[in-house]
Amino acid sequence: MKTVLLLICLLGSAFTTPTDPLNYQFGAHGQKTAEKHKYTHSEMPEEENTGFVNKGDVLSGHRTIKAEVPVLDTQKDEPWASRRQGQGDGEHQTKNSLRSINFLTLHSNPGLASDNQESNSGSSREQHSSEHHQPRRHRKHGNMAGQWALRGESPVDALGLVRERNTWKYNKNTVGLDENNNGSEEEEAGEEEDEEWGEETDYRDMKHRARGTSHGREYRRWQNENSRPSGEFLRDSSLPVRITKRHGEKFSMEEESQEKLYKEGKLPLSKKNHNEDQGEKRQSEESKEHFQVVNQRKHRAVTKRQDKEGSNAEEDDNDSGDDGEEDLGNVWREAVYEEEERMQSNDQDSITNKQKEEITAGDDSGVYREMQDYKGDKIKDVTHSEDNHYHHEPPNSSSKQQLQTSSSVESMNSTEHEDEVKTTGGSYHEESARNSTGKALPDLCRNFHCKRGKVCQADKQGKPSCICQDPAACPSTKDYKRVCGTDNKTYDGTCQLFGTKCQLEGTKMGRQLHLDYMGACKHIPHCTDYEVNQFPLRMRDWLKNILMQYYERDQDTSAFLTEKQRNKVKKIYLNEKRLVSGEHPVELLLHDFEKNYHMYLYPVHWQFYQLDQHPVDRSLTHSELAPLRASLVPMEHCITRFFQECDGDQDKLITLKEWCHCFAIKEEDINENLLF
């Protein structure tokens, strides 16, 4: 019986020896908990020996050996071979369950295969090591069991073994793994073994910390490679871990070999990190190069504007001057268009200043958008002002004629700037195509503006400059866009007219050539003294009728007159004594003016206010009068002489007082408060 009992104790101790590999738990910071590695005593509660796996976590690196309970009194008569067979079956079942768990782990996380292999090798090494230290314990257990058997005590009671069950739970993918941990021994035997293994436990704790740090680095690298959040890896068990010095040396050698691989860059993870670092460096270099290119563009744009200002100043100087031998009409026309060109030059300077400010504040694309918006606003203002000038009913004409003339004049003046933009853009695209084979010249003429009749072109050095527009290269126009020059020649459009003027620059003919009026050239009879005296009567009636038509249209759209203007015009419109528009004899017009004098006060002031825009100084230059004159010349051949005679002091400026005197407004009725 003693021999049988001794064999049972030896076999039970062999199968209850813990052979787990290193147990680690990586939390949020990849650190292990030291409490999980303490040796389990018989007094320790059952709750501390139970490990749980959280939802979505991956269990790896665990090996559990099913413990065998010592034979009870009822099992003493069983044959030893049957018990051995039962133990073998239990071990076989345990191995099969572990293989299924390892397969699930490797299938869910292929990247952890290396960790599992390392854990498997560690488990086998630890099992051999633990068997190496078992004979001494077995002899002690056998001696004590023999003494207690002589006293008649049960081996189970004598050894005080407690059956413990640990269960790991997989949430959603439940895998039940029952472990029978034989973790209770006598207090005396536990104390002796603690003293015996004290040195190894200290060494084990030290290696745990080193291995924890190494595995923490490997985990962080694996997490960066996958670039997605991964679950925490719990490598925890309630079973104690025993590492001998020989195992510690093997672990150290493995760590050194892994560190060498990472340092040499042989692992794919390190290669990927290296490529990512190179990509970030390239992106930073590209951003720096883009910033330098933007700064260079800004510097070139500022230089272009300075060069343009100098060229515009020279061109204005060349265009100035009058010929002393010219007659009074030609002198007036030349002064009108010199003033008009000077105004356009001032507008270009203001645009240039605005562009410089925008360049300082933002990039080139933002400057271009702001410049285009500004030009669009200028065109709208000029068009609206010209609408007020050209939508007038020509004296002694019907409403149908007035609408046709107004639409023709409006389209002609609204496309005047469009012709300039088109020709400039065409030259720019041709130049860009011309330089496509050589060095690229980006945005050289985009923000470089030339006055009418000239286009931008870059020279061999890449510097933009203004050259004369080729009249033959101007786009084709429709008949209503034709204009008549002061040389009594019809041009297809303003592009052709000012291109011809630019080619004749520096000559007497070039200085005299200007836009005379809209439409094809026709015979303009000479204005007699009688006709020029009747002209103010027709002009006053025309201004009054224009305001009435604007008021009628504003009742639906409110696009022509302001609220203050509508209130003023409403009183005239509702007056029953008002003379309706139409062709009336001169006598009737004079009678209505004397009878309803107050109805003509505001229309005369209103027309002066509409013309006095560049600048608003209570006086009209010939440039400010030119749009109105050019639109009315075909119908009123006396308008040029009328404006000349209104300038009593011949200073090329028509003040508000001179304007009102031309329309027979009394001096006491001249009121600047009506200029709205």
Swiss-Prot record:
Residues 95-108 have a biased composition (Polar residues). Residues 634-669 form the EF-hand domain. Residues 397-408 have a biased composition (Low complexity). The keyword Secreted applies. Residues 35-151, 173-369, 385-437 are annotated as: Disordered. Residues 462-523 form the Kazal-like domain. GO terms for cellular component: extracellular space. The keyword Amino-acid biosynthesis does not apply. It holds the Pfam family SPARC_Ca_bdg. InterPro entries: EF-hand-dom_pair, EF_Hand_1_Ca_BS, EF_hand_dom, Fol_N, Follistatin/Osteonectin_EGF, Kazal_dom, Kazal_dom_sf, Osteonectin_CS. It is found in: Secreted, Extracellular space, Extracellular matrix. Ca(2+) binds at residues 647, 649, 651, 658. Keywords: Calcium, Disulfide bond, Extracellular matrix, Glycoprotein, Metal-binding, Secreted, Signal. GO terms for molecular function: calcium ion binding; collagen binding; extracellular matrix binding. Residues 35-44, 249-266, 273-291, 385-394, 415-433 have a biased composition (Basic and acidic residues). Glial (Mueller) cells of the neuroretina. Residues 184-202, 312-328 have a biased composition (Acidic residues). Could play a role in the late stage of neuroretina morphogenesis. This is SPARC-like protein 1. It comes from Coturnix japonica (Japanese quail).
